[in-house]
Amino acid sequence: MHNPDGSASPTADPGSELQTLGQAARRPPPPRAGHDAPRRTRPSARKPLSCFSRRPMPTREPPKTRGSRGHLHTHPPGPGPPLQGLAPRGLKTSAPRPPCQPQPGPHKAKTKKIVFEDELLSQALLGAKKPIGAIPKGHKPRPHPVPDYELKYPPVSSERERSRYVAVFQDQYGEFLELQHEVGCAQAKLRQLEALLSSLPPPQSQKEAQVAARVWREFEMKRMDPGFLDKQARCHYLKGKLRHLKTQIQKFDDQGDSEGSVYF
């Protein structure tokens, strides 16, 4: 109990003098004996979140650097081009280059090749000129067939063999002359008929055109007659065979004359 003069009571606890009235009011009374009073929870010292004012989060400003001319840059200089809109006023920035475009380097003068007029003419002639008788690409020429008489009648090695060559020559020489005469006469007639048909004036009517066409067909039939073609081929074969026999006989005779002759 407090006295009106404000001094403490002598019956009071000496330790209670240090407590304030607010602390004494907060302390719960001690539980009575025989009664289990429910424990009161101590109010939290924290204030509700609603009492705090929401403050915006501080934003971190980008570092500012000074360029070579003393101007402030909001972004540090990097390998890429400066961003548009962040460059200081009064400073012009070049347009960004695409990464695939090569940087312009020093101009290199190309060496010029001097070509004379005669060289151009020679190159043009070489390109236009083709070898005569050249084998086309991919074409395999057929081997030239060797006549059978060249294999059947080798060079003469004895007098007996020479006599056999002479007999064959004389036997087929008469046949050759006969065939040559027949084939020659037929070829002469065909040449005359062809010249006559070529000299005829153009037909004036349909009948004349039909006659001329019939004569030309007969001319082609005679020239392509199988009997005439066989005689012509036989005559050509005998001519080559007789020439080969004559050459082999002459070589043997020339060799015998050179061996039997004596030089002083």
UniProtKB/Swiss-Prot annotation:
InterPro entries with a match to the protein in the record: ELL/occludin (IPR031176), Occludin_ELL (IPR010844)
Q: Where is the composition biased (Polar residues)?
A: 1-10
- Ranges for region Disordered: 1-112
OCEL domain: residues covered:
147-257
Q: Ranges of Pro residues compositional bias?
A: 96-105
Matches recorded under Gene3D superfamilies: 6.10.140.340
Highest taxon in the source lineage: Eukaryota
Q: Which GO terms describe its cellular component?
A: apical plasma membrane; bicellular tight junction; cytoplasmic vesicle
Pfam families linked:
Occludin_ELL
**Gene Ontology process terms (BP):** bicellular tight junction assembly
Q: Which PROSITE patterns match?
A: OCEL (PS51980)
What protein family does this chain belong to? Belongs to the ELL/occludin family.
Q: Which PANTHER family did the record assign?
A: OCCLUDIN AND RNA POLYMERASE II ELONGATION FACTOR ELL, OCCLUDIN_ELL DOMAIN-CONTAINING PROTEIN 1
- For this entry, the protein name equals Occludin/ELL domain-containing protein 1
Q: Which organism is it from?
A: Homo sapiens
What gene name is listed for this protein? OCEL1
